[in-house]
């Protein structure tokens, strides 16, 4: 006990805070202390298997140590501690603080000890008629029994009330920084044992097909706790290390390690790992550690050769787990958290609700499980910033529809993480151990050999889309197997598209189950009131002259009507014009009114469209120059107001970002010598990008104030574009909400790039070339450029990965374009190369950039797909029907099948047609009443065009085709009517001449007539030539 050092500062801070909360609670009617004016916390003898409950938790919270056979009596102004002499020595140092403490020493004399107990009971009675105790107190031993006997005898009129919830709320639930630091360390230690250590051991066993018992594997993990060298060298999944000040001696087990597989699962993890062998199926591992008395727990499910049903169930579990973690906030109740989880199950797979656990977690800290903070369907406890929770989601007793053996008939799934509640998204202490299906699924069985997919037919770009189907590349039927395979692929694609179209129709009817009447689509415009002046004294001074006054400051035109100045806000005026008639000039001011039906103003809202409106006012004056000036002022004011409103509208979706939290204690990760797009104002020079705690920052070297901050919470997609086939290497960030970059440039895309090529010089004829024959120098230059490009790719990809790791709590992942699936097209004005990624279709090399998120696409339509055209267009319609459809035009027709394959594999329903459609009109119809649109068939009107054009390939090869019987009859009749067989011409005129051959003239006669006609024609030409000469002479 000589090494015991109690931190008196922390003791005083915590007990003062606790006493203040207690006093405030007593003032409320339904306080958590239940009106207790004194509190008793008992500790019995040391237990063989130590368990942490609220009685020893209060010891650790206040003193940092557990003092067995010790009684604590709290009153509102003093703490009394009854303990042995040895322990009392360590408590003496706490005296003299702000909160008084009195230490009572008990010895071996039973009578003296009883007097001390009686003294404490007197203090209880002095405090009040209620004493707070811990209801489920597990303390045991003679010391406890003696106290209970004295308390029962001397405090008969004092009632005992439970203070468990009060201790949890005011002492244990909300952690300070030192407590959170201990929990983070415990969590990292859990992650280190789970992955890489347990994961590697399990993988090796399964890979080698060894027979290892659960208990044996658990013991192996257990022994690592005492392996000091392991804790010094272990590397976490993020390649990071454990804290340098980690003391392995202060680590202790609170759970497991528990390993389960082979159909026997207990998600309470109440018992030890059994002696069954590790089974290659669903494997669950759970473990919990305590560090400096603070607990953390982790559990993961690993799927070995799972079937589709198991994968589907696990993906549902990860969806539930990640969703509730993301949505937990300060102020939510425990039952709301559980309700969110059940709501997801009911919407996705209602049949799984009966297998779901009865709670989704509990409070954790000094206690492994706080029974007053269980996240179930009944608990009304409010979560607060600083609380730490175990989030434990799982399904149990699930029947396997396709068991691979007798041990796979039933399985369970569970995920457990330790988190900290904040006012925004929680901090997940155990996040470094992955939970995704991709990371936790293992496939050891060899997949069945599949036949290689037939190569696509290379198409001639000079031939139209439809015409290519009429050209065969083979002569013999035996060579046409590829054609048949392509037809099968096309058939499967058509069937899949029909399924997708039906699914879209169902989803549309479900999303818009009631008439929307513009509530989803075109935004219903509201009548806006404009107030020029609030009081009379705000009118311009010039109104005294009863003349037309243009008040630019208040965007108002004041007109004299019936001897009184009447203000008209500029938004009520349509336009103003000046005209001359004789010696008079006329100023005509037109106002906005319903029913004008001009341009985009037809839907201009009015408070009462049936009221009487003044459409125009005309003023007459002999001062034409003044009226000309007034008309110009009104026009300029109108233009400025419209421009201002447009700028305001453009900036509506620009949100003010939180401040970037800079890294102060170390140098941030930096990528230097990069350019930014959109470019900053001023000279174009390369800057640097830094990764900080909650985002990244670009800094210009010219001015430190010229910087761009991008927060991880605002990152929607992160792309790395290698410099292969390009002149630059790129890190591209697509944002959720636009930000302002440079000189008031609004953008949703921020890009950092570096040029991949240096300036090349032609060294032909220089001295070096004199003595070097061949292309050695060109070869060296090419090699050097290849090395430089590879180094740039490695540098930028590595930095992109660092950004993703820093923003992993926001779900940021690096995505790369797949060049093999790319195609040329014109999304704006220039022809660019568009490439798909995992989640998007992008073009980030040339501005303006193009980023289309596949999940946001409702349907795609291919336009101008018809015979003879060398290219086609593609239109994306988004699920948010208020967004304008996105066009990618002039795609070469040889990419048609490739584009269709990409859309089909991305589960995007597509249609095709021969013409360009009027999409603004179509979307206006959709948004006018979306429910009615889907009730009338939805997008099926596009599908109808596709079906008419698409037909069966056999129909396109010939416009006329006979069946075999008709063909036989036709052959027989043609043989009977002609002696020339199948080689005879089908032309009727030729047949008539041949049939009458015996009645015609012979060859000599025909030749003679021909010569005569030649002579006659020659004479006619001579006569014509002579006549021309005569005419010239005249």
UniProtKB/Swiss-Prot annotation:
Which GO terms label this protein's molecular function in UniProt?
Answer: nucleosome binding
Q: Which Pfam families match?
A: FACT-Spt16_Nlob, Peptidase_M24, PH_SPT16, Rttp106-like_middle, SPT16, SPT16_C
Instruction: List where Basic and acidic residues composition bias occurs.
Output: 452-462
**Stretch list, region Disordered:** 444-464, 502-521, 942-1034
**Any one Gene Ontology biological process term?**
DNA replication
Task: Please name the SMART domains in this protein's record.
Answer: FACT-Spt16_Nlob, Rtt106, SPT16
Function, in words: Component of the FACT complex, a general chromatin factor that acts to reorganize nucleosomes. The FACT complex is involved in multiple processes that require DNA as a template such as mRNA elongation, DNA replication and DNA repair. During transcription elongation the FACT complex acts as a histone chaperone that both destabilizes and restores nucleosomal structure.
- What is this protein identified as? FACT complex subunit SPT16
> What organism does the UniProt record list as the source?
Gibberella zeae (strain ATCC MYA-4620 / CBS 123657 / FGSC 9075 / NRRL 31084 / PH-1) (Wheat head blight fungus)
């Amino acid at each position: 006990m000589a090494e015991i050092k109690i931190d008196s500062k922390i003791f005083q801070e915590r007990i003062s805070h606790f006493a203040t909360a207690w006093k405030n609670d007593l003032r409320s009617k339904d306080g958590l202390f239940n009106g207790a004016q004194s509190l008793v916390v008992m500790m019995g003898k040391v237990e063989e298997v130590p368990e942490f409950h609220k009685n020893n938790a209060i010891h650790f919270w206040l003193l940092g140590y557990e003092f067995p056979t010790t009684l604590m009596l709290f009153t509102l102004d003093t703490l009394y501690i009854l303990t042995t002499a040895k322990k009392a020595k360590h408590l003496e140092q706490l005296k003299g603080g702000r909160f008084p403490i009195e230490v009572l020493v008990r010895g071996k004399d039973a009578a003296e000890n009883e007097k001390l107990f009686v003294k404490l009971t007197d203090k209880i009675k002095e405090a009040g008629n209620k004493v707070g105790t811990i209801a489920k107190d597990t303390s045991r031993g003679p010391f406890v029994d003696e106290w209970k006997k004295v308390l029962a005898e001397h405090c008969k009129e004092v009632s005992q009330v439970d203070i468990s919830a009060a201790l949890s709320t005011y002492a244990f639930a909300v952690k300070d920084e030192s407590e959170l630091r201990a929990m983070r360390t415990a969590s990292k230690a859990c992650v280190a044992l789970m992955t890489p250590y347990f994961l590697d051991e399990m993988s090796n066993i399964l890979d080698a097909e060894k027979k290892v018992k659960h208990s044996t594997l658990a013991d192996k993990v257990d022994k690592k706790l005492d392996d000091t060298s392991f804790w010094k060298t272990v590397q976490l999944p993020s390649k990071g290390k454990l804290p340098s000040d980690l003391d392995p001696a202060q680590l202790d087990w609170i759970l497991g390690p528990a390993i389960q597989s082979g159909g026997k699962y207990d998600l309470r993890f109440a018992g030890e790992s059994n002696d069954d062998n590790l089974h290659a199926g669903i494997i669950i591992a759970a473990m919990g550690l305590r560090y400096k008395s603070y607990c953390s727990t982790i559990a993961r499910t690993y799927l070995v050769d799972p079937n589709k049903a198991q994968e589907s169930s696990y993906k549902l579990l990860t969806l539930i787990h990640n969703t509730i973690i993301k949505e937990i906030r300060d102020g939510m109740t425990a039952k709301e958290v559980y309700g969110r989880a059940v709501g997801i199950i009911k919407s996705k797979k209602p049949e799984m609700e009966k297998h779901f656990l009865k709670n989704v977690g509990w409070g954790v800290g000094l206690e492994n499980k706080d029974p007053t903070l269980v996240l179930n369907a009944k608990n009304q406890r409010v979560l607060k910033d600083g609380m730490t929770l175990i989030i434990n989601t799982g399904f149990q007793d699930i029947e396997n529809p396709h068991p691979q053996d007798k041990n796979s008939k039933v399985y369970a799934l569970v995920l457990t993480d330790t988190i900290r509640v904040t006012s925004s998204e929680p901090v997940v202490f155990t996040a470094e151990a992955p939970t995704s299906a991709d990371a936790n699924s293992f496939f050891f069985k060899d997949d069945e050999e599949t036949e290689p997919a037939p190569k696509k037919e290379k198409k001639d770009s000079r031939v139209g889309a439809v015409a290519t189907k009429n050209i065969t590349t083979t002569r013999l039927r035996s060579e046409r197997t590829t054609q048949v395979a392509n037809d099968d692929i096309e058939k499967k694609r058509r069937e899949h598209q029909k399924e997708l179209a039906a699914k879209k129709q169902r989803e549309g009817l479900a999303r818009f189950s009631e008439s929307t009447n513009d509530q989803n689509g075109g935004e219903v415009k509201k009548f806006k009131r404009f107030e020029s002046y609030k009081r009379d004294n705000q009118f311009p001074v010039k109104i005294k002259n009863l003349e037309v006054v243009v008040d630019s400051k208040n965007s108002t035109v004041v007109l004299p009507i019936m001897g009184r100045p009447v203000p008209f806000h500029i938004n009520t005026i349509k336009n103003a014009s000046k005209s001359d008639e004789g010696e008079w000039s006329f100023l005509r001011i037109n106002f906005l009114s319903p029913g004008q039906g001009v341009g985009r103003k037809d839907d201009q809202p009015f408070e009462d469209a049936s009221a009487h409106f003044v459409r125009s006012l005309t003023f007459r004056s002999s001062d034409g120059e003044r009226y000309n000036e007034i008309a110009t002022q009104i026009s300029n004011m109108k233009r400025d107001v419209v421009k201002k409103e447009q700028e305001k509208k453009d900036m509506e979706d620009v949100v003010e970002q939180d401040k970037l939290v800079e890294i102060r204690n170390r140098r941030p990760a930096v990528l230097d010598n990069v350019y930014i797009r959109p470019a900053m104002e001023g000279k174009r020079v390369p800057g640097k990008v830094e990764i900080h705690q909650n985002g990244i920052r670009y800094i210009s070297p010219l001015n430190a104030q010229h910087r761009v901050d991008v927060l991880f919470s605002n990152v929607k997609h992160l792309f790395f574009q290698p410099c292969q086939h390009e002149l630059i290497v790129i890190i591209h960030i697509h944002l959720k909400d636009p930000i302002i970059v440079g000189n008031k440039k609004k953008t949703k895309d921020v890009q950092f790039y570096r040029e991949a090529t240096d300036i090349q010089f032609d060294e032909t004829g220089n001295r070096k070339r004199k003595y070097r024959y061949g292309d050695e120098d060109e070869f060296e230059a090419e090699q050097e450029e290849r090395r430089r490009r590879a180094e740039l790719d490695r540098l930028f990809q590595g930095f992109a990965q660092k950004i993703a790791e820093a923003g992993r709590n926001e779900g940021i992942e690096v995505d790369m374009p797949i060049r093999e699936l790319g195609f040329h097209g014109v999304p704006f004005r220039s022809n660019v190369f568009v490439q798909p990624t995992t989640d998007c279709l992008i073009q980030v090399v040339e501005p303006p950039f193009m980023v289309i998120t596949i999940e946001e696409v409702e349907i795609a339509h291919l336009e101008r797909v018809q015979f003879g055209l060398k290219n086609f267009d593609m239109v994306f319609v988004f699920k948010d029907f208020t967004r304008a459809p996105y066009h990618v035009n002039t795609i070469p027709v040889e990419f048609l099948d490739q584009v269709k394959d990409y859309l089909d594999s991305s589960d995007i329903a597509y249609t095709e047609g021969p013409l360009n459609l009027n999409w603004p009109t179509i979307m206006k119809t959709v948004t006018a009443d979306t429910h009615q649109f889907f009730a009338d068939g939805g997008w099926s009107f596009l599908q109808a065009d596709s079906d008419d054009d698409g037909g069966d390939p056999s129909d396109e090869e010939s416009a006329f085709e006979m069946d075999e019987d008709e063909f036989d009859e036709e052959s027989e009749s043609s043989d009977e009517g002609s002696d020339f067989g199948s080689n005879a011409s089908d032309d009727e005129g030729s047949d008539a001449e041949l049939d009458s051959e015996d009645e015609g003239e012979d060859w000599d006669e025909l030749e003679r007539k021909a010569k005569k006609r030649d002579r006659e024609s020659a004479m006619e030409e001579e006569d014509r030539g002579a006549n021309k000469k005569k005419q010239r002479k005249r």
